[in-house]
């Protein structure tokens, strides 16, 4: 299962490619979780069900963010320890991250289920969409713990030198989700409950695959027993605090997508009603695919940057960063062109032309796609600062992008530009973030030159 990878001496381009290809493929399979639900729900149940799933989406983006936070933080810490020859410490770090995040998500899941109807209303559900939103959450929330294990396990398995197996975990989960979606929705007629249950079973299988690898097949990083003495628990909490500090910007990145969905749902339902939310939901199904590709590029660069940062090899860090930025920009431009040229085809994947939401989405997606180019630069910039233990800077960038600039976009543009302004809110957010990252980069260069 282990691939031939040496983070400290292998050619950067070769090393990056070895990590990138299976990681991107794995992320594409992860995206199938998202897009398959959208296609089957839209085609098999209707636009109201599509809107209801989008209403609940911010909750699941938050859950994904928790997994990314612990995954990124633990991976950075473990990478640096591995570069210093501390294998046992690295294994303890990843075990603590998985155990603590699983406990946290179980507690949050119980609270969400207890307050499920008020939660659906808080997320913006109308009376018409409420029964569908509640039903979807009721069949997905109980299984979120496996989604967390799958998310964190991906980082650990790639760091262990097995990106291909990490890809397979996502692939098996996604393929199972597709098969079960078709059976539950079209053959058994289980409706939105079937869509939620299919996704849940897929994540259960993927999560178990990661646990089996870390328990039985890993060669460097192993799950180990956590001591329950007071001293050990205090050390665990200290380590968890540092992991959260390093990975918090990853959580905020995911939470910013949740914020985008929440604000977008709120603004669209005010201006265009449920049809507007259904149209926006198509963009929200498409956006995570873009996010996952950029995230795959950032995640492929992360262990290389972290390892060589810990080993004191700045030139290898610089080469990896530049390669990641070039790769992300090529993808961003390609995604934008694809969105403009294939807009109607993308929308028709989810809903028929007979729905009013179809024309709203076709007219709006090209505006929305402008942001994909700037989003590419932003993801790599945030990932770089995480990888070199500058978590505070990464967190500030992510907060500006996910909250401050997003609020400016959604509430400043619509009064001026009307409906196109709603679609352009996210691109404006990404553009402002790119300007900020470029500004601090120039500031850092100026300080270095003065020295």
Where do the model's predicted regions map?
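Short alpha-helical transmembrane segments in multi-pass integral membrane proteins
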Residues: 1-23, 78-143, 187-247, 305-371, ...
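N-terminal transmembrane alpha-helices
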Residues: 7-45, 58-73, 77, 81, ...
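Transmembrane helical elements of multi-pass membrane transporters/channels
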Residues: 18-37, 150, 173, 202-206, ...
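Helix-terminus/linker motif at the lipid-water interface of multi-pass membrane proteins
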Residues: 32-50, 120-127, 183-190, 251, ...
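Small-residue hotspots at the loop-to-helix junctions and early N-terminal turns
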Residues: 47-58, 133, 137, 196, ...
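Small-residue-rich hydrophobic transmembrane alpha-helices
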Residues: 50-110, 147-166, 279-337, 341-343, ...
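Hydrophobic transmembrane alpha-helices of multi-pass small-molecule transporters
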Residues: 62-65, 109, 177-181, 207-211, ...
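Short runs within selected transmembrane alpha-helices of multi-pass transporters and secretion channels
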Residues: 71, 140-158, 166-174, 195-210, ...
